[in-house]
Amino acid sequence: MIGLLRKSRVEKDLTEGNFMKTQLNYKFWFCTGSQDLYGDECLSHVAAHSKEIVECLNKSGKLPFEVVWKPTMITNEVIRRTFNEANNDPTCAGVITWMHTFSPAKSWILGHQELRKPLAHLHTQYNREIPYETMDMDFMNENQAAHGDREYAHILSRMGIERKTIVGYWQDAEVQEKLASWMRTAIGIVESSHIRVMRVADNMRNVAVTEGDKVEAQLKFGWEVDAYPVNEIAEAVDAVSQSDVNVLVDEYYSKYDICLEGRDPEEFKKHVAVQAQIELGFERFLEEKNYQAIVTHFGDLGALKQLPGLAIQRLMEKGYGFGAEGDWKVAAMVRLMKIMTTGMKDAKGTSMLEDYTYNLVKGKEGIIQAHMLEICPTISDGPIQIKCQPLSMGDREDPARLVFQSKTGKGIATSLIDLGNRFRLIIQDVDCKKVEKPLPKLPTAINFWTPQPDFYTGTETWLLAGGAHHTAFTYDLTAEQMGDWAAAMGIEAVYIDKDTKIRDFKRDLALGSLFYGK
């Protein structure tokens, strides 16, 4: 499946400069099921109704991508041909199916054996209300999604086909919103196989949770994870011209608040210029080698003058994934989430985060989320400062970094872990809050959250599941979307949310071990 999905990417939208600024140019095919038993008049109504539904969905303003009507699926040959055309169309990101009439499900077997695009089963019907006074057998034959969709869903279940099922009336906002939400998951499924992670350094020595099977990750997710000597990318940094550095530094100084904290302005600016040079050198190297995510490690900086900080933050803001201390799984997940939220209106941001320290005051419990330097400014709330302070990690010059407070609101924290013979995705709902008091001596960007259902249950279940201290965090996706992505990838997903109970969670972990293989 991964191999065929690789054809689906619309290359031009993600390889031009500043590659997350353009809306992905994908479409979703609407395939209505019927059969020729009912005659031409009925089939003409089926086609007309399907076109009307597609037009309504596209005009709703709720869908992030266009829906494309396809001729009615009435035979095995038509279904098989259409699905293979979907496989080979690089603009098709998924298929939406609906049975207007009864559609014998054996006709769908060969097509679904060959379909390699994400699938949503929209269980709806053309008419909202039963026409009590006029309904006759002709109407019954023509409008029997309640019948046809059950037949269709049966064969999908028998074949073990992963799909999203959406139930409701096609004009209702909640149905359109569910379809829109699934579209973003489908983009994640399709685009996953285009994620390439550049490792500028190996895993932090003796750390367990950031390790993982890169071959299995490519088999499961399509991710390519490659290592480059740090001094090779350092050469790309050194090759950046001073004039280019000056232009970018000027941009920094116009965009961010400069916080000298007693440092000499010229000396401060030189430290900032090092990060500008790193940003330009890293980005050019990533573009040249066609990578969309990067990992670094403070223990392996080679000829780099500073630990990349502001530079990495800016790259994440542009859409690149990042993981610290060699954490390629987080880098890939951050990239994935940024793809899934591309073009989202009022997006609040996505970033790598790390659990740092707790507040254990009763009624005020929470976790400070930060890192030494590298938090994405898309999650910032209010002014962003550039600060330059000493950092013992890395034994290099004082690195410049962006410092800010994060937005409040609901988000999800995810941790993809390698359990030895399989992957598990842990998904936790969190409530992001403002810190109670300022942190004047902490020169990092921060987030502060309380995990659901409460600090104690949320933390205990995270530990039971084996969750990492690094997370891929976003305000803009839901646990359902990420769980659907995990299901499409064939891996376990565990949820920690407002309804989580310790006893039930332990049972879910035990059942997951049995199902996915302990």
Language-model-derived ranges and their functions:
Residues 71-85, 175-177:
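Structural motif
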Residues 250-251, 255-343:
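Long, internal scaffold/assembly segments composed of regular secondary structure
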Residues 79-92, 109-111, 279-288:
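Short, well-structured alpha-helical segments in soluble
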Residues 44-59:
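Short catalytic helix/loop segments, enriched in acidic residues and glycine
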